[in-house]
């Protein structure tokens, strides 16, 4: 094994981490909770709710006024890392650990839930890393060194879900992963993986989780992000929590390691504390035997990092007033780009600052025992019990899901009949469950269910082979790389002159080593159209490339606008010479309806690529959201994760007038690549000049969409009337040209 150690005054050497990786094995298994330090004295102060301090850390900015103290709150602090390049994530993990994170959650690449087995090597991901043994092993090895540096165990975490859940669970147990997401309901509701397969797989996965002593987090919080109105799924959330919690306990997971993933459902300008606190109280009343993983609200984040941060501080007030064993953080830039280094650190510092600032709060205040708080909490519990009873009356969970009972936009028992429905005899993995024969035997540890080892006279299954990979890690077959091009060695070679330590060059970066990304914050004493155009002109004059405005905040409709822009590295401005962006051209509802009555219109639409987002597209098309259906446009919705080929083929089969492609994930410009691919396929099939092609998504810009082959692109803030107007006017153009 390499004798490489971190130098506190030097950069981490990722090449050294990768050296001799095939011989690395984790030095510990299981989750590590922080050690409480009641009555902790630091500087001139005494703390009531803190944990043992770190050996090495970066204090909050004002700490120099107080002797550079850096008290650590009691809850575990989570940071989620999702750059797509694990080698860069290792550096970010070190940053986060020094700012108080001891739970590093690694996000998977888009679509990995649907992979039917393990993958190997170190390919680049989209919106996360492709979780492979090599990448897990390298990051766990790095965290071993980082936790020695900061003086506290660091928990490494990823996801045990999808079609290959048990395969991943085995690998995670082997490689010393400390925490996991595991909830078969996530597979069923959000990934459309067959129900029976999902629950059978979950039994095997949870058995391994129990063996490894991992903390398990459920997936109920996804209902918050998916529901039309997040505060209306609170009763259902408690039922989802209950199903996974008791299921996990019965399989054998220790209740002290079963964590409920709870999210305050609202954000201001809603009266969020008034709505969210009774829910938090009700949840903790019902599930006092289990741990609480307090997530932060993501559904209502916009592009303002300030607004997101305030929302997250309010979320942590609820954690403090109730309880949180794990305080997850969300980067405040999640609403505008793949999270950057600096915002992972901002999120960690926000959690530390807020929780330490509220130290000792519950010695001075208490939640009222009567009145609105308790009455509302009881009401929510009653609604949850009614939900559970109705689910049982319907024949159980599977039947209830098939009937669309979950993620309905009504506050149960109110129903709007728009929930997510999955078929018992449908979904990915259908028909893959096989009953074990009477002589079935698997010589492995932590195996769920029937295992006939008595026929061989063994007491422990793995004794038959001298121990399985869980007991004897030398039996693990380590595969380094499978792809000669898509791997970390190639990526690191491309930027080797920027690699620390001993770099020859340095560039600013936000996501990847030497990516050259910078951000500019500007204020212009003008309306938003002029301010946006002027900001872009500033960036051009600074010779930035890949320029994009990522946030616009109106200070006053006429007096001023705050702009944030990003670009890559490689002044009075005459406003009259600026090319101002045009406001959306919107026809009246009557005008649009009249044209559709004149000539009916048929469109096919779906979320393309390996992308499961659906809410935004639904708002564009659904009649109940004021979408294009209300004008009489015939809509054929193909769902999520739609391959570009399927969208074009559907347009051909249905003789559609238009294709609508939604694309939310923007990592590595995958949204524009998919737009370009759809345009190319339609051209090759000979229909491109006969069909209107519209693309949309939160990160889609009109000009870039058109440059990649779409007729128009619609970004954040677009509505059904904007899209309908464009469809009608574009059809007029094609009619004049004799193409429609």
For the regions a protein language model found, what residue spans apply to each?
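Glycine-rich phosphate-binding active-site loops on the catalytic face of alpha/beta enzymes
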Residues: 100-113, 175-192, 244, 315-338, ...
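Active-site mouth loops of central-metabolism enzymes
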Residues: 15-26, 74-91, 153-164, 227-232, ...
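Short beta-strand/loop segments at the ligand-binding rim of alpha/beta enzyme cores
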Residues: 68-81, 148-160, 213-214, 285-299, ...
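Active-site beta->alpha loop and helix N-cap motifs at the rims of alpha/beta catalytic domains
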Residues: 29-65, 77-99, 103-234, 555-557, ...
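Domain-level signal for soluble alpha/beta catalytic cores
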Residues: 1-2, 24-37, 113, 336-337, ...
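Structured C-terminal cap/extension of enzyme domains
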Residues: 325-329, 339-374
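Catalytic alpha/beta core domains of metabolic enzymes, predominantly
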Residues: 127-131, 140-144, 160, 181, ...
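Conserved, mostly hydrophobic/aromatic
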Residues: 96, 319, 613
């Amino acid at each position: 094994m390499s004798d490489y150690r971190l130098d506190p005054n030097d950069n981490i050497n990722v090449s050294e981490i990768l050296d001799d990786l095939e011989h690395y094995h984790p030095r510990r298994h299981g989750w590590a909770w922080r050690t409480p330090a009641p009555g902790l004295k630091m500087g001139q102060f005494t703390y009531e709710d803190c944990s043992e301090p770190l050996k090495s850390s970066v204090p909050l900015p004002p700490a120099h006024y107080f002797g550079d103290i850096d008290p650590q709150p009691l809850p575990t602090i989570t940071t989620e890392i999702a750059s797509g390049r694990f080698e860069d994530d290792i550096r970010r993990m070190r940053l986060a650990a020094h700012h108080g994170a001891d739970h590093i959650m690694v996000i998977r690449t888009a679509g990995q839930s649907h992979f039917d087995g393990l993958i190997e090597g170190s390919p680049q991901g989209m919106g996360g890393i492709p979780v492979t043994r090599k990448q897990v092993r390298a990051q766990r090895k790095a965290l071993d060194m980082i936790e020695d540096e900061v003086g506290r165990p660091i928990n490494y975490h990823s996801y045990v879900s999808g079609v290959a859940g048990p395969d991943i669970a085995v690998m995670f147990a082997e490689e010393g992963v400390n925490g996991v997401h595991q909830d078969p309901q996530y597979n069923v509701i959000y990934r459309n993986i067959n129900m029976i397969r999902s629950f059978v797989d979950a039994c095997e996965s949870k058995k391994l989780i129990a063996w490894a002593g991992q903390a398990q987090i459920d997936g109920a919080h996804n209902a918050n992000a998916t529901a039309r109105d997040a505060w209306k799924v609170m009763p259902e959330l408690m039922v989802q929590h209950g199903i996974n919690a008791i299921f996990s306990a019965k399989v054998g997971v220790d209740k002290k390691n079963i964590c409920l993933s709870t999210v305050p459902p609202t954000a201001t300008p809603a009266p969020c504390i008034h709505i969210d606190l009774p829910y938090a109280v009700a949840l903790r009343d019902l599930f006092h035997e289990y741990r609480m993983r307090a997530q932060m609200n993501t559904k209502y984040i916009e592009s303002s990092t300030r607004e997101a941060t305030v929302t997250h501080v309010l979320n942590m007030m609820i954690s403090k007033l109730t309880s949180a064993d794990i305080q997850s953080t969300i980067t405040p830039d999640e609403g505008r780009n793949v999270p950057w280094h600096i915002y992972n650190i901002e999120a960690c510092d926000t959690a530390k600052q807020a929780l330490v600032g509220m130290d000792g709060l519950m010695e001075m205040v208490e939640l009222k025992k009567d009145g609105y708080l308790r009455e509302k909490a009881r009401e929510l519990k009653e609604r949850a019990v009614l939900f559970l009873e109705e689910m049982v009356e319907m024949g159980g969970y599977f039947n209830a899901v098939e009937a669309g009972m979950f993620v309905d936009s009504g506050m149960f028992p109110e129903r709007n009949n728009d929930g997510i429905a999955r078929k018992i005899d449908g979904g990915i993995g259908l028909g893959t469950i096989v009953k074990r024969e009477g002589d079935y035997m698997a010589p492995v540890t932590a195996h769920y269910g029937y295992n006939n080892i008595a026929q061989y006279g063994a007491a422990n299954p793995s004794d038959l082979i001298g121990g399985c990979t869980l007991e004897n890690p030398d039996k693990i077959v380590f595969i380094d790389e499978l792809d000669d091009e898509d791997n970390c060695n190639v990526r690191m070679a491309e930027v080797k002159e920027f690699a620390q330590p001993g770099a020859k060059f340095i560039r600013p970066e936000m996501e990847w080593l030497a990516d050259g990304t910078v951000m500019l914050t500007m204020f212009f004493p003008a309306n938003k159209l002029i301010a946006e155009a002027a900001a872009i002109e500033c960036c051009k004059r600074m010779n930035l490339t890949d320029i994009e405005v990522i946030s616009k905040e109106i200070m006053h409709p006429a007096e001023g606008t705050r702009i944030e822009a990003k670009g890559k590295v490689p002044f009075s401005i005459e406003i009259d010479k600026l090319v101002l962006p045009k406001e959306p051209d919107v026809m009246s509802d009557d005008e649009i309806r009249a044209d559709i009555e004149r000539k009916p219109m048929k469109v096919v639409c779906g979320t393309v690529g390996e992308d499961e987002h659906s809410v935004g597209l639904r708002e564009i098309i659904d009649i109940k959201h004021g979408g294009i259906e209300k004008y009489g446009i015939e809509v054929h919705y193909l769902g999520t994760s739609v391959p570009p080929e399927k969208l074009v083929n559907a347009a051909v089969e249905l003789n559609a007038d238009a294709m609508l492609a939604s694309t939310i994930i923007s990592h590595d410009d995958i949204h524009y690549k998919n737009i370009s691919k759809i345009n190319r396929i339609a051209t090759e099939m000979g229909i491109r000049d006969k069909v209107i092609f519209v693309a949309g998504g939160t990160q889609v810009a009109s000009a870039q969409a058109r440059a990649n082959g779409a007729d128009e692109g619609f970004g954040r803030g677009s509505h059904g009337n904007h899209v309908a107007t464009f469809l009608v006017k574009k059809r007029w153009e094609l009619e004049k040209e004799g193409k429609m």
